[in-house]
Design a protein with these regions (language model features):
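Conserved beta-alpha junction segments in alpha/beta enzyme cores
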Residues: 35-124, 128-245
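Short linear sequence motifs
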Residues: 2-3, 23, 148
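N-terminal export signals
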Residues: 11-31
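Twin-arginine (Tat) signal peptide motif
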Residues: 3-11
Length: 245
């Protein structure tokens, strides 16, 4: 039976399996060190996913093509393998999300090429509201002309190929590593259902408490090599990040 985990559960359980021992304070964040005898391997890969053509952007209030580039968009993969050889892969990308048709193709290819089952792979997204549209995602929200339909389909196919290849690279890069988990705090997330956006800056400046539930915790996983070099830092945050308007 497939068991679907949340991102927080994935981060927590992946590192807790190493039988954590010590907790070292680090300001508002702590890291728990993994048991020395635990054998972990980690592999990392990344790829630029900035479109080379003017693919419609997803997440704006109206359909919109790109008008320039502030910086590249990225897709990254972290592969983990425990002492028994069990593998999991976490993939993050600068998309708003991916449609089911695309994710089905990705999972099919990962199973065929690397024998990764669905429960061994997690897709996460920066959900930046200014990345390219994929497949039939938001097709009812962003009706576009035939030329754009073709561009989006072409770009989506490229991303499936690039994502699968990137996972293969991460698996090929598996090497001994130490995992540590911790938790920090960041307070910029605001409950927008209970606080009017225009009033938030003044309320914060006045020290007036905002209302409504929020989650300001930042779960963190640090991946280091045996020589102490930092290989990767993985974190998550509960916030709806509309970065551009």
């Amino acid at each position: 039976m497939n068991v679907h985990k949340t991102r927080r559960q994935f981060l927590k359980q992946s590192a807790e399996a190493a039988a954590l021992l010590a907790v070292a304070p680090m300001g508002s964040m702590y890291l728990s060190a993994a048991e020395p005898e635990a054998v972990w391997k980690a592999g990392i890969a990344k790829a630029v996913i900035t479109p080379e053509k003017a693919v419609w952007l997803a997440g704006y209030g109206s359909k919109r093509p790109p008008d320039g580039k502030l910086h590249d968009l990225w897709m990254k993969a972290l592969a983990l393998e425990d002492a028994t050889g069990k593998r999991v892969v976490l993939i993050t990308s600068d998309f708003q999300g991916v449609p089911k048709g695309m994710s089905d193709l990705v999972f099919e290819q990962l199973q065929m090429q690397f024998r990764l089952e669905r429960q061994q792979v997690m897709l996460t997204f920066s959900h930046n509201h200014c990345g390219p549209r994929l497949g039939d995602d938001l097709v009812d929200y962003y009706p576009v002309e035939a030329e754009q339909v073709e561009l989006v389909a072409e770009y989506t196919a490229q991303m499936v190929t690039k994502l699968v290849a990137m996972v293969g690279e991460a698996l090929a890069n598996l090497a001994p590593a130490k995992l540590q988990i911790g938790e920090g705090k960041a307070t910029f997330a605001v409950n927008r259902r209970n606080n009017k956006e225009a009033e938030v800056p003044a309320l914060l400046a006045a020290g007036t408490p905002l209302t409504g539930p929020v989650d300001h915790t930042v779960p963190v996983m640090a991946v280091t090599r045996p020589n102490g070099d930092m290989a990767a830092i993985l974190f998550g945050y509960a916030c709806h990040p509309t970065t551009l308007s």
